[in-house]
Amino acid sequence: MTAILERRESESLWGRFCNWITSTENRLYIGWFGVLMIPTLLTATSVFIIAFIAAPPVDIDGIREPVSGSLLYGNNIISGAIIPTSAAIGLHFYPIWEAASVDEWLYNGGPYELIVLHFLLGVACYMGREWELSFRLGMRPWIAVAYSAPVAAATAVFLIYPIGQGSFSDGMPLGISGTFNFMIVFQAEHNILMHPFHMLGVAGVFGGSLFSAMHGSLVTSSLIRETTENESANAGYRFGQEEETYNIVAAHGYFGRLIFQYASFNNSRSLHFFLAAWPVVGIWFTALGISTMAFNLNGFNFNQSVVDSQGRVINTWADIINRANLGMEVMHERNAHNFPLDLAGVEVPSTNG
């Protein structure tokens, strides 16, 4: 009898825990995805802060020339970064217990792998938590779908690209100048500016900014005034009010006359779907482009493709980009190799006389 009572009590305790985890009455919703999200993001954030301040130099290229990335080793906020895991480690899973000592783990850039893997797991769980909360509240699932765009982008640069290139040392450093260095080297090696998926991403980001500004300014300019001229129009809104807060007909009429009639949405739901879908689809394509370039399916190459009737090259913008790419490739990892791959692999032309 005692055993039965204890089992009921334990089940009741577990039931209360489940109800608390999945309750939408909490100030912050936890959810089952949150059970994994909270420790992984806390771990990634804590290690990032500590490593950004105090991590010793990392042998990123695997050639016994460590690179400093932390504040205590001479960097500032702009130049500081979490240096990627050493090329000597490659794609190996490298937790602390795999190293002979903590010093060796730090020298080989172990914190980068720890931060990135916990971060990716955490943001994926954050996306799942968005879906879970939407489900509990009876909402549609599109918030999580929209968030999948930045999740895909982060996964592409921190995981898919290193897998394709064969080493976590090719992942994006966790810092401001490190991000720019990653972008420049990516252009040099993959010609990303000439990749159509990157172009779609640029259109998505800049177009999304433009459409967001257009929508916000149109709505703000067509508010239905509920206040006097001496009060702010914003003071006329009551949270949860049933009435429309702006006149979509007026906004439609303005924009239709500014551009042309069919450039303006007359359906608020279609408008907001478009505002969400445009940047999300663009960033999806960019993440897909990064993931294909990870395996060296690079951007378009039109180098020296225009020649005259005598076979002489007519330089185009593509040739200018090619020369810039070679310059950038020569400069990066300058101690790891003497020549960029496309220079080293070309046979020297023979000369007569």
From Swiss-Prot:
Q: What is its EC number?
A: 1.10.3.9
What chemistry does it catalyse, as a reaction equation? 2 a plastoquinone + 4 hnu + 2 H2O = 2 a plastoquinol + O2
**Where is the major localization of this protein?**
plastid
Query: What is this enzyme's class at the first EC digit?
Result: oxidoreductase
Question: Per its UniProt entry, which superkingdom is the organism in?
Answer: Eukaryota
Q: Where is the site Tyrosine radical intermediate?
A: 161
Processing after translation: Tyr-161 forms a radical intermediate that is referred to as redox-active TyrZ, YZ or Y-Z.
Say yes or no: keyword Phosphoprotein present. Answer: yes
What the protein does comes down to: Photosystem II (PSII) is a light-driven water:plastoquinone oxidoreductase that uses light energy to abstract electrons from H(2)O, generating O(2) and a proton gradient subsequently used for ATP formation. It consists of a core antenna complex that captures photons, and an electron transfer chain that converts photonic excitation into a charge separation. The D1/D2 (PsbA/PsbD) reaction center heterodimer binds P680, the primary electron donor of PSII as well as several subsequent electron acceptors.
- Its recorded name reads Photosystem II protein D1
